[in-house]
């Protein structure tokens, strides 16, 4: 008779313990139900990137002196700089400058070490294409400034994640 009573007591304790665990999980679920979602509706809402964000590189053709410092500091020797030596003035003349963003790791070394500041990072990060050859930007494509997220009236901008919660 006593083993049956002890088994019943163990069963009761196990039931109470299981109910407590289920209750704890349910309380956590209810505490998260009051919070707003952290996700944003991406094409229509975008986070404003920080000033130091390393997006697509912007290139100013007129400032470049074809020194090739950007190529030397790039860990993957990515920028392609074509130039011709002008013998009458003894200076290099830039013919072509291109960067393949399919290979670029966006480290920012080229921007940091450029002596004439002809390279800068933009806030553009939507570089996806269906053809990888479209990611090879020449000096004309690199010279175009992207539209700022703040200036685009079709997009609702969100400063940071704390603004989503309020």
From Swiss-Prot:
Organism domain of life: Eukaryota
InterPro entries (alphabetical): 4Fe4S_Fe-S-bd (IPR017896), 4Fe4S_Fe_S_CS (IPR017900), NADH_quinone_OxRdtase_chainI (IPR010226), NDHI (IPR004497)
Enzyme class: translocase
GO-annotated cellular components: chloroplast thylakoid membrane
Pfam families: Fer4
UniProt: [4Fe-4S] cluster 2 binding residues: 74, 104, 107, 110
Chemical reaction(s) catalysed: a plastoquinone + NADH + (n+1) H(+)(in) = a plastoquinol + NAD(+) + n H(+)(out); a plastoquinone + NADPH + (n+1) H(+)(in) = a plastoquinol + NADP(+) + n H(+)(out)
GO MF annotations, alphabetized: 4 iron, 4 sulfur cluster binding; iron ion binding; NADH dehydrogenase (ubiquinone) activity; quinone binding
UniProt main location, coarse: plastid
Cofactor note: Binds 2 [4Fe-4S] clusters per subunit.
UniProt: [4Fe-4S] cluster 1 binding residues: 64, 67, 70, 114
Cofactor: [4Fe-4S] cluster
Assigned keywords, A-Z: 4Fe-4S, Chloroplast, Iron, Iron-sulfur, Membrane, Metal-binding, NAD, NADP, Plastid, Plastoquinone, Quinone, Repeat, Thylakoid, Translocase
All residue ranges annotated as the 4Fe-4S ferredoxin-type domain in the record: 55-84, 95-124
Signal peptide: none
UniProt membrane topology term: Peripheral membrane protein
GO biological process, one term: photosynthesis, light reaction
E.C. code: 7.1.1.-
SUPFAM superfamilies xrefs: 4Fe-4S ferredoxins
Subcellular location: Plastid, Chloroplast thylakoid membrane
Subunit comment: NDH is composed of at least 16 different subunits, 5 of which are encoded in the nucleus.
Role description: NDH shuttles electrons from NAD(P)H:plastoquinone, via FMN and iron-sulfur (Fe-S) centers, to quinones in the photosynthetic chain and possibly in a chloroplast respiratory chain. The immediate electron acceptor for the enzyme in this species is believed to be plastoquinone. Couples the redox reaction to proton translocation, and thus conserves the redox energy in a proton gradient.
Family designation: Belongs to the complex I 23 kDa subunit family.
Protein name: NAD(P)H-quinone oxidoreductase subunit I, chloroplastic
Organism: Psilostrophe gnaphalodes
């Amino acid at each position: 008779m006593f083993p049956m009573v002890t088994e019943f007591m163990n069963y009761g304790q196990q039931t109470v313990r299981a109910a407590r665990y289920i209750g704890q999980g349910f309380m956590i679920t209810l505490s998260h139900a009051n919070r707003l979602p952290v996700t944003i509706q991406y094409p229509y809402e975008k986070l404003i990137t920080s000033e130091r964000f390393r997006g697509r590189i912007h290139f100013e053709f007129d400032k470049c002196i074809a020194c090739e410092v950007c190529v030397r500091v790039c860990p993957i020797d990515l920028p392609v700089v074509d130039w011709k030596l002008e013998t009458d003035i003894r200076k290099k003349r830039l013919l072509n400058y291109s960067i393949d963003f399919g290979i670029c790791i966006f480290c920012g070394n080229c921007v940091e070490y450029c002596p004439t500041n002809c390279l800068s990072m933009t806030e553009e990060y939507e570089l996806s294409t269906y053809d990888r050859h479209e990611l090879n930007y020449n000096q004309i494509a690199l010279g175009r400034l992207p539209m700022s997220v703040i200036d685009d009236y079709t997009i609702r901008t969100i400063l940071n994640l704390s603004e989503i919660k309020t």
